[in-house]
């Protein structure tokens, strides 16, 4: 654990804390823009959106549990469900840590394929 922490801190020092925050802001915005382009709605108001995780409202007719299963089994991507009263109302995409722009692009492409399989008729081409 101590070695892993040392490696993580070295990586942070190398990138620089300001650059880390900029990267997270860029990835958060990229995720939100991509999700909206697919015809989905962001759960949080734009001014309150997180740069570490994006919560997406599950559209009517979409089985959120099935969507998460498809993403994991067919694309190797884990989406988190909502918690407590939001369990069946949202799913979450994490983009904190060592996440790249290419990984966000892959996630969005996979989501575009998986959504219709889970009942979403509104995927934009």
Where are these regions (language model features)?
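PLP-dependent aminotransferase class I/II
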Residues: 11-17, 33-44, 60, 64-65
